Amino acid sequence: MAGCTAASEPETPVEPTPTSTVDETPNSPTPTVSPSPTPEPTTPPAGPVEPTGDVQVIVTDLDVPWDLAFLDDGSALVTERNTARIRLVEPDGELTDIGEVPGVSASGEGGLLGIALHQDWLYVMFTAGGDNRVVRMEFDGDSLGELEVIVEGLPKAGIHNGGRIVFGPDGMLYIGAGDANDGARAQDLDSPAGKILRVTPDGDVPDDNPFDGSPVWSYGHRNVQGLAFDDEGRLWASEFGQNTWDELNLIEAGENYGWPEVEGIAEDDEFIDPVLQWSTDEASPSGIAYARDTIFMAGLRGQRLWQIPVPDGSAGEPEAFFDGEYGRLRHAELAPDGSLWLLTNNTDGRSRSGPGPDDDRILRVGLE
């Protein structure tokens, strides 16, 4: 690793199951609990919240959009997995190319993946020729500066590359690293694969990480593609299961989430159970967003948006929205105006019905 060095999703939905403590998987039942003017930031109502049914198409014809990060003015930077482009999307739908990230090797589920902003830096995670890595570039609002590698050596594969990155309230960078199609790596603390990693903005290992000298924050993960912090600083993660259960997990430092020894709720004291689980045909979860005591989880194979009340760190009964209306949903992100932006993902080669004439799109969803 520099600073620090160190899969595939089925297509079908199921219902979450409540638990105590997440992955990507095949078919089963429904989850159980164990373009407008530039928006002005508003004071949101108390949560939990849910979609109002007011959905606007912000922009169309994107090429495999994977992640987005909002700027203060309500516009967003969007990554395209296969083209390696970063594009600026205005709330009124105006689209501008900011630049192309050099060194991206797009194949299978790999390519230009997660994006995050921190101070004057723009961070992205991508698949390179020999590994997955996190880099940063200075961003002046119009163009990208020189690329600096901060984490490298994360195992890559045609599937299970993880890819989501997010800064926590502690100022540290959290990285979802997939198992790169080798489940044994998830239990190997000497490998960064199958983990959630935590590093400083420069890519160094923080002194207070749970394993001395290691970027590993939690382990036993198959393919984490959603990361979000709630108002209390708790970290939530969505994870693809294999053939049985997809998961929503509440992440604790140093804990083992079980893959590949267990999938879903195991009630085994050796592992942390997911907070909720879904059969893989109802979820195949990717990006998640937190808004007012609520987690919103985008479903790829499930082709729906899950709304999950999470008051006090516990999960209520999930509810599905937009089932099949927009196809595969890659990511959900809370906008500065209090709405939710959704990325569709029907141009990624995995859609059962193929892309529609306007795919891929960004949708703006009102919340109440």
PLM feature segments, named:
Residues 96-107, 147-161, 199-218, 255-280, ...:
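Surface-exposed loop and turn segments in beta-propeller and other repeat-based domains
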Residues 216-243:
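Repeat-solenoid scaffold signature
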Residues 142, 168-174, 198-211, 229-233:
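Secondary-structure boundary elements
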